[in-house]
Structures are given as structure tokens and as C-alpha cells.
């Protein structure tokens, strides 16, 4: 993202000097018009929470937080650190003002200096006074040249193959027993929550690519993982859809590295990849190589690591292998392709397993959670369009850790 900001500043404001801060104390005091710094350098110096960094000793004319939703946790070291930056003008740039709940929005307002007691019950006033919102449609109304080609989104609902269904039912029943045992024992609430989340993780992995679940069991038991010999309807559908468009570049957004490894091993085309382990310089090389690659190339991206801050307009096909917790995460991922500079229609397909006859699908339950978060965001922004940006199967009240427990009927 830092590289992208630097390139955009050079493009639109070439007369401004830019300093990319890398932790060197002398560089922070440069005479540059703009200093760009990663969030990580606001928190790494000093062992104690709240230790100042060289950035805190400067008085800035303006502080701008890109991807500002990163400070949504008020108890985090990052939130406390950015609030201590010295400036009279503060901006937050984000496409996700509400990530999980209304409290996220309150955190952003706190950074801006808006009292919490003023925020509650006054979201419309806050929006009118403090939020400048521009959607892609809004920009097109201002300047027709900024109108993007259409973006078509489809939830591809699939049935599990027989062998997948059998494994998922086993995982589901096992999760029931594990959760029931945890709540019978005198464990702490945090321990019980961890048990529930681990069961959910295993069920999600099982639905995406069963070998990930088997690998996790092997690691936990200290044994060699059982090899998955069955088929995967989700993976076979993904590969078939890619093969149907051999002259178009594709993005595949994944949740886990395990599925990325498998997908990469099965594709017979130029494949590029970004996950959480890929360093900055290699990311840039992967992006540039994908842009210069021949039609048919595929970019596999871990959605948490590359779902924001990338320009990949060369791709016209976007595949999401499983629902994310937050619909905004998926929207940001789609925005890597469907953004200014895109000249062709973009087609997005999200692969979701439907409920089994005897057991609910954790993926469909996550879709329900997406519906709730879309409603909260639309209420904060006073904009019903938010609800329709990503189609969801149904909406529900907020899902808590106990609701996740109830998914397993435990």
C-alpha cells in the first residue's frame, strides 16, 4: 500500500516531496511535504504499551489514516498510539467504517475527537457533519469518464459430494461433543470461547478443502495426517469455471494457505500468489509479473493479506472460495479488479456449500452474519445501498459466540 500511495502522489502531485519512513529517526524530521509510514512502526519501539516513537515527537499539519478501520479496537496498542499523534487535523480513509459492530464506528469517531456520548443515537448527524462519502456510482455522476463497467456478483450454491458430506457430518458431531464437554467442565469463559472457535475453524476448513481439516488433526495429535482420497465439489467447480475462460485473467481469494497450496498445485497456467508470509518486495514482483503475464494467468490471494491496497485491473474474473466474516472484506477484495482503470465487465463468483439434510452449513451461517453487518453499516451511513452490494441468503440479529455454539446444536 505504501508503494501505491507513493506512485499515486508522484502521478497527481509531482511537485510534492515524499518521505517513506522506515524507522530511521533522522528521516522522520525531513523537510518532505508528505511522510508515509506503516502502522507497524507506530507500535514496535519500546516494550511497554504506549511507548512513543519518533513519529510522536513531531507536530504534523495533518494526519491521515488509510484503511482507518485498522484502529477499530480501542484497547489495541495501535489505537492508543495513533490517538497520541500530535496534530489539529485528522482524517480517516476507509471503505469499512463498520467492520463488526457499532463500537468500531465509535472508535473511529474517538480518534477524530468526537465524544462517545455524542455519537450514540446521532449517527445521521455524524454522517452529515463528519463523513464525506463517495461511492463508484457517485463518482460516475460527477464525471461520466469515471463510470466503471458492470460488476456481476453471484453466490454459487453447491451440494457437497457424498464423501465430503460424510466427513462434514463427522466433524459436526465431533464438534458437538467437544463443545458440550467444555461447557460441562469448569473451564474459564475464554477457554470455552476458544473451543467453540476452533470447532468452527475445523468445520470451515473441512468445507473448503477437506485435506486442511485432516492436516490440522494430524498436527494436533502429533501424527502423520490422513490423506484425503475423496473429491471436492467446490474445488472441481472452481477449476471448471477457470477453464471456461482461458483468455481472461482471474483472481482467487482464499481464506487459508492450505487451500492456496492445493489450488496452485492443480492449475496448468501461469500462477502468482500473495499470502501473509510473502515479503513486500516479493509482493511487488508478483503483482508486476501478473500484470505482464499472458491472458489466462491466475493470481491466488489470501483475502486477509491482499484483499486491500492492490491494483489488479487486468483481472476480469474474481472467485471467492468461501464467505468471509465481514461483507466489506469481500467488497475490498473485489475492488482489486473493479476499480478506476478497469475497462471490461467484472464477474465475481463466491462458492458456498448449502446445508446438509441433517446439519447446518457453517458457510450459510456466516452469510447470515454478513447480512447483519450490512444492516449495521447501512444504518450508520444512512444508505440502503450497502445492503445490496453483496447478496446474502438472509439476515438475522447479531451473532455472538453463543450463537456460534448453537450452530453445532451443542
What are these regions, as identified by a protein language model?
Residues 36-37, 41, 77-87, 110-216, ...:
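Inter-lobe coupling linker of SF2 helicases/translocases
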Residues 40, 69-72, 97, 258, ...:
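Catalytic acidic motif of RecA-like/P-loop NTPases
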Residues 101, 260-262, 299-316, 326-343:
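SF2 helicase motor core recognition
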Residues 144-164, 186-299, 303-310, 386-410:
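Conserved Helicase C-terminal RecA-like lobe
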Residues 55-121:
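Signature of the SF2 helicase/ATPase Hel1-core->accessory helical subdomain module
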Residues 325-334, 338-410:
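A conserved SF2-helicase RecA2
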Residues 107, 310-323, 347-350:
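A short beta-strand element within the Helicase C-terminal
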Residues 1-76, 116-117, 182-183, 233-235, ...:
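SF2 helicase/translocase NTPase motor core
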Amino acid at each position: 500500500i505504501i508503494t501505491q500511495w507513493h506512485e499515486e502522489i508522484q502521478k497527481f502531485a509531482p511537485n510534492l516531496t515524499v518521505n517513506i519512513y522506515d524507522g530511521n529517526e533522522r528521516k522522520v524530521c525531513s523537510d518532505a511535504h508528505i511522510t508515509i509510514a506503516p502502522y507497524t512502526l507506530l507500535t514496535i519501539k519500546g516494550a511497554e504499551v504506549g511507548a512513543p516513537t519518533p513519529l510522536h515527537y513531531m507536530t504534523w499539519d495533518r494526519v491521515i489514516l488509510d484503511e482507518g478501520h485498522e484502529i477499530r479496537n480501542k484497547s489495541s496498542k495501535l489505537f492508543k498510539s495513533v490517538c497520541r499523534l500530535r496534530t489539529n487535523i485528522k482524517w480517516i480513509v476507509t471503505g469499512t467504517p463498520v467492520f463488526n459492530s457499532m463500537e468500531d464506528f465509535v472508535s473511529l469517531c474517538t480518534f477524530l475527537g468526537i465524544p462517545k456520548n455524542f455519537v450514540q443515537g446521532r449517527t445521521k448527524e455524524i454522517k452529515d457533519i463528519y463523513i464525506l462519502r463517495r461511492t463508484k456510482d457517485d463518482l460516475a455522476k460527477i464525471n461520466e469518464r469515471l463510470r466503471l463497467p458492470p460488476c456481476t456478483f453471484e453466490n454459487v450454491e453447491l451440494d457437497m459430494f457424498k464423501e465430503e458430506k460424510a466427513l462434514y457430518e463427522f466433524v459436526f458431531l465431533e464438534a458437538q461433543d467437544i463443545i458440550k464437554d467444555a461447557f460441562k467442565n469448569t473451564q474459564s469463559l475464554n477457554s470455552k470461547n476458544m473451543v467453540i472457535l476452533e470447532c468452527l475453524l475445523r468445520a470451515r476448513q473441512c468445507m473448503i478443502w477437506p485435506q486442511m481439516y485432516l492436516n490440522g488433526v494430524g498436527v494436533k495429535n502429533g501424527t502423520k495426517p490422513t490423506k484425503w482420497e475423496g473429491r471436492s465439489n467446490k474445488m472441481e467447480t472452481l477449476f471448471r469455471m477457470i477453464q471456461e475462460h482461458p483468455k481472461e485473467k482471474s483472481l482467487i481469494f482464499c481464506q487459508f494457505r492450505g487451500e492456496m497450496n492445493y489450488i496452485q498445485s492443480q492449475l496448468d497456467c501461469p500462477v502468482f500468489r500473495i499470502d501473509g508470509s510473502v515479503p513486500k518486495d516479493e509482493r511487488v514482483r508478483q503483482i508486476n509479473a501478473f500484470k505482464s503475464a499472458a491472458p489466462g494467468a491466475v493470481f491466488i490471494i489470501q483475502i486477509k493479506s491482499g484483499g486491500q491496497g492492490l491494483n489488479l485491473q487486468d483481472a476480469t474474473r474474481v472467485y471467492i472460495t468461501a464467505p468471509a466474516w465481514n461483507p466489506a472484506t469481500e467488497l475490498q477484495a473485489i475492488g482489486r479488479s473493479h476499480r478506476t482503470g478497469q475497462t471490461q465487465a467484472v464477474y465475481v463468483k463466491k462458492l458456498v456449500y448449502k446445508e446438509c439434510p441433517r446439519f447446518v452449513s457453517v458457510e450459510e451461517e456466516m452469510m447470515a452474519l454478513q447480512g447483519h453487518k450490512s444492516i449495521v453499516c447501512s444504518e450508520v451511513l444512512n444508505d440502503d445501498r450497502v445492503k445490496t452490494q453483496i447478496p446474502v441468503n438472509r439476515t438475522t440479529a447479531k451473532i455472538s459466540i453463543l450463537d456460534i455454539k448453537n450452530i453445532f446444536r451443542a
